[in-house]
Amino acid sequence: MNQKALKSLEYYKIIDQLTEKASSQMGKDLCRHLLPSEDVYEIRHMQTQTRDALTRLFQKGNISFGSVKDVRGSLKRLEIGSSLGISELLAIAGLLENTNRVKAYSRNERGDAREDSLDGMFESLEPLTPLSAEIRRCIISQDEISDDASAGLMHVRRSMKVANDRIHTQLASLVNGSARNYLQDSVITMRNGRYCLPVKAEYRSQVQGMIHDQSSTGSTLFIEPMAVVKLNNDLRELGSKEKEEIEHILDTLSELA
């Protein structure tokens, strides 16, 4: 069918209306690229599919695809051996979980023994439940990987907690003891990824350590006491190991996808 005929029939206006009804970006893209068939057998088959789809909708209600993210770019990256990030893996897990819900929309679930033209389409769906479950087990949210994602990550994070506790114990003893009178506030703060104390500038020589920052007025120096320099170094090294372990976890999940 030529473009002139399509315009005369206002075909693209119909496509625009259909596209607005699609709840996912991938669905919208499919709608935009639909073209009418000129094959009478294909037309009859698609009409049968439309009728069967309406029957399912009337019997069981609508299927939601609104939560589905566009993962086509991620799948292309996997094809060339790239590893995916947290948000990409969560999007794939969400798609697979939605696939599982859609598959439950089968003929047997409707309690209807009659076969229809959509059965094969639903039966071909593979939710890959073990993969989505593993992604959810390892990734808690966009910003957090579970401690249980790997034995290595759990070990590193336990070591980080021990190091953090030791640093806070050392600094608390200074805040409540020998450095008490030299501090602007009795708080432990962080500067450049290092735990520091807010020392009054005039008492700089009374607190041995490294200056990492100062207040806008210059009245407060943020000093990392010598007593915690090695502990801070250990903590930073553990932080690097944590990042490496997380990258390894994401690599492993990407290989499974």
For each feature predicted by the language model, list its residue ranges:
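Extended, Lys/Arg-enriched charged tracts that mediate electrostatic binding to polyanionic substrates
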Residues: 154-203
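Conserved amphipathic alpha-helical "coupling/scaffold" segments
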Residues: 1-152, 156
